[in-house]
Amino acid sequence: MLTTLLQSDLPGLPLRHCGKVRDVFDIPRKRLPVDTRSGEYLLIVATDRLSAFDVVLPDPIPGKGEILCQISNFWFQKTEHLMPNHLTGINVASVLPDGIDKTLYTQRAVVTKKLKPVGIEAIARGYLIGSGWKDYQRTGKVSGIQLPDGLQEAEKLPDPIFTPSTKAAVGHHDENIDFDTTVKMIGAELAERVRDATLRIYHFAAKYAAECGILLADTKFEFGTDIDGRLYVMDEMLTPDSSRYWPIDEYQVGTSPPSYDKQFVRNYLETLDWDKTAPGPTLPQDIIDRTRAKYTEALQRLAGINID
């Protein structure tokens, strides 16, 4: 049975970062298994918070964090032959403080390596949609990459492209950047490794998703390095929050297809007299239920996991 969690409450675990959806805690070494105490580890909790237009909304989507965690874990396991990831395999319950309801966390949290984020969002696009479509209409390019003339909205690109962005703080907007800017920010060697890993994973995931009847239009990864400079994929992976998934049977060039994400929420918010700054408006129950159903369907179709 799915639980609902809006804010993590874990006495004894120092809160390192509170993001739009995830709460990140340092794990004191005394709480770790003896054979892992030589490293540094984090507990990452996927809450049921929902953000839209970079604003965290007041209403949670029940079970969303569990669904996101399970989808991420599925993809981390499925792509580990392509790229190492931040997971450790340490049992979540073993690091949680005593005296809390651990069932709130065991299906929505993971113990991870503590890595140094590379400082950019790594985005792969296989289709022309969203901010990429807007850039193309204005300049004929996406993140500095020249594309053929005459492409339509939602059209498949000749080849997937790497279109990084800055990583903004909560409440601020990410900005698309070109590869040269990425090189200036993180260095040429690391930029090339991140680009190559992003496209490698995208190719693999898009092929698998298509076999499930789903198009992976675009997706966003985060990467980090360890003290030896080894690159890992981290945070979340190929979830409906970080990816644009479309049902193949509803895909049509020239229009924005329905997606397995919070589009119901965005569409509803666009009907309101709201300036897209905090605090966000409350959501009707129907919008919450329909959004949750989309996340649940994505988990079932991609990972074969039924949670209801």
Curated annotation (Swiss-Prot):
CDD domains: SAICAR_synt_Sc (cd01414). GO terms for biological process: 'de novo' IMP biosynthetic process. InterPro entries: SAICAR_synt/ADE2_N (IPR028923), SAICAR_synth (IPR001636), SAICAR_synthetase_CS (IPR018236). Gene3D superfamilies: ATP-grasp fold, B domain, Phosphorylase Kinase, domain 1. This is Phosphoribosylaminoimidazole-succinocarboxamide synthase. GO terms for cellular component: cytoplasm. Its EC number is 6.3.2.6. Coiled coil: none annotated. The keyword RNA-binding does not apply. Pathway: Purine metabolism; IMP biosynthesis via de novo pathway; 5-amino-1-(5-phospho-D-ribosyl)imidazole-4-carboxamide from 5-amino-1-(5-phospho-D-ribosyl)imidazole-4-carboxylate: step 1/2. Belongs to the SAICAR synthetase family. The lineage of its organism: Bacteria, Pseudomonadati, Pseudomonadota, Gammaproteobacteria, Lysobacterales. Keywords: ATP-binding, Ligase, Nucleotide-binding, Purine biosynthesis. One of its GO terms (molecular function) is phosphoribosylaminoimidazolesuccinocarboxamide synthase activity. PANTHER family: PHOSPHORIBOSYLAMINOIMIDAZOLE-SUCCINOCARBOXAMIDE SYNTHASE (PTHR43700:SF1). It catalyses: 5-amino-1-(5-phospho-D-ribosyl)imidazole-4-carboxylate + L-aspartate + ATP = (2S)-2-[5-amino-1-(5-phospho-beta-D-ribosyl)imidazole-4-carboxamido]succinate + ADP + phosphate + 2 H(+). The gene is purC. Pfam families: SAICAR_synt. HAMAP family: SAICAR_synth.
